[in-house]
Amino acid sequence: MGGLQPWHWVIVIAVFVLLFGAKKLPDAARSLGKSMRIFKSEIKEMQSEGKSDNPPATPITSERVDTNPTAEQPDKRSA
């Protein structure tokens, strides 16, 4: 009990053959293999990008420009 017996695997395989048909199973396995290869290559690429020697980008500082008219500037509406 608790573990899968060999006859459990036979039943699982029989259900897959009945659901998908014998012709579609090789294509499904092939596409699953391709997907796994692509996934693994993307994971390796992401890990290599994380270990790059580039220093972290410095934040860009900017000055704030006040767009409200001040008392020093004459009001254009009253002229």
From Swiss-Prot:
Disulfide bonds: none
GO biological process: protein transport by the Tat complex
Pfam families: TatA_B_E
Topology of the protein relative to the lipid bilayer: Single-pass membrane protein
Record key words, sorted: Cell membrane, Membrane, Protein transport, Translocation, Transmembrane, Transmembrane helix, Transport
Extent of Basic and acidic residues compositional bias: 43-52
GO cellular component terms given for this protein: TAT protein transport complex
Annotated GO MF terms: protein transmembrane transporter activity
Family of the protein in this entry: Belongs to the TatA/E family.
Record text on subunit structure and interactions: The Tat system comprises two distinct complexes: a TatABC complex, containing multiple copies of TatA, TatB and TatC subunits, and a separate TatA complex, containing only TatA subunits. Substrates initially bind to the TatABC complex, which probably triggers association of the separate TatA complex to form the active translocon.
NCBIfam families per UniProt: PRK00575.1, tatAE
Function text: Part of the twin-arginine translocation (Tat) system that transports large folded proteins containing a characteristic twin-arginine motif in their signal peptide across membranes. TatA could form the protein-conducting channel of the Tat system.
Protein name per its UniProtKB record: Sec-independent protein translocase protein TatA
